[in-house]
Curated annotation (Swiss-Prot):
Protein name as catalogued: Protein-methionine-sulfoxide reductase heme-binding subunit MsrQ
Membrane-topology descriptor: Multi-pass membrane protein
Residue stretches spanning the membrane: 14-34, 45-65, 82-102, 118-138, 149-169, 179-199
Gene: msrQ
Native species: Bordetella pertussis (strain Tohama I / ATCC BAA-589 / NCTC 13251)
Co-factor binding comment: Binds 1 FMN per subunit. Binds 1 heme b (iron(II)-protoporphyrin IX) group per subunit.
Subcellular location: Cell inner membrane
Amino acid sequence: MPAAPLTARAIGRIKPLLFVAGLLPFARWFWLGANDGLSANPVEFLTRSSGTWTLVCLLVTLAITPLRRLTGQPALVRLRRMCGLFAFFYGSLHFLAWVWWDRGLDPVSMLQDVGERPFITVGFAAFVLMAALAATSTQWAMRKLGKRWQTLHRAVYAIGLLAILHFWWHKAGKNDLQQPLLYGSVLALLLGWRVAAWWRRRGAAR
């Protein structure tokens, strides 16, 4: 027997739990900092950790649509915006770590880095796209943009690919591709599901 559909009240109860869960990595950094647990290089640790959690939140966001369809729970879509905003939150911290700690708030140095280092180039492109989606994630923006809103927000797939490429190139320099392969496989699975669903709909429409 299929599970009963989630009600608006149930989603309202889930959202605070999801919000707390989304802040746990951020809270953990403070706890580690207070207990001298940020490794021998705190800057590198926080930069890498914020990047990892950006990718995790992005993959969770992309998993919402397959999950709601496979479980028959369309109301899960109401959680997608929060997941996406957490991806942008951690992405902003990752970007800030690069701007502040790595580039010393120097615009010229930042532009040179974007132009000369491919993994920075794709990471910067992913962040710009994420910022555009975060800025247009409101109901007002949805009404204002109309059909263009959905077209714009399909950029989340490009963001996912750019984020994996950014991670891959960064780790390739250290010959450590285990994590990029793992996250890349999850992204491939999520995008593959969407392609298969699109193909089935296309076949049914013939």
